[in-house]
Amino acid sequence: MASVKKFSNQAVVNQLRHIERTITSPKNTDIIPDREYLNYSLIPSRGISSYEYFKQRKAELYCYNRKDVKVLAGWIVTEPKTLFPHQQEHFFKIVHNFLCERYGTKNCIQSIVHADESGQPHLHFCFIPVAPDLKHGGEKICASEVLTQSELRNFHPALEKYLNENGLNIKILTGTTKAQGGNRTVSEMKLEREQIYSMDLCRERW
């Protein structure tokens, strides 16, 4: 149901543009241009672009001066097939709130629902992975301390509990979800191959 990927600084611009659909010739063949109007953001307008906000927030944090530092992370959460159409907006709003509480509202760079692709609608939630900086004081960018193996292992159970507590009695911990990160169609798995790492792959690399 959900998977995550990390991005280095040089990949941030293209990732944000891809999610905002501002790339002139996108490589993702699953995008249906006539349905782009169905996409929507869950973040109130900040008066600046998401990239400008990213730079502002990043400047407030300690960050190691290395090209391989992962300065952005992105969860993609897919709408369950058992969800009724009238529940969709409520579902994504709850998921957005869950992620903001988990990773910090001011660290959220983008939160956009895509409904213009084949397969199930899904939420892209991009954030700066921020952790306490015990050495320098304040906060630092550190994906390895935020997206730990424990965090990845507990993500789905915590999300299911949060959904249930907020009025959506959705079971997402099926056998497939536990093993592969979600109940996915062929097109959804193709989407994941192009845009995200699976939960198991994340565990192996992190």
Language model regions located:
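N-terminal nicking endonuclease/strand-transfer module with a His-rich metal-binding environment
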Residues: 1-206
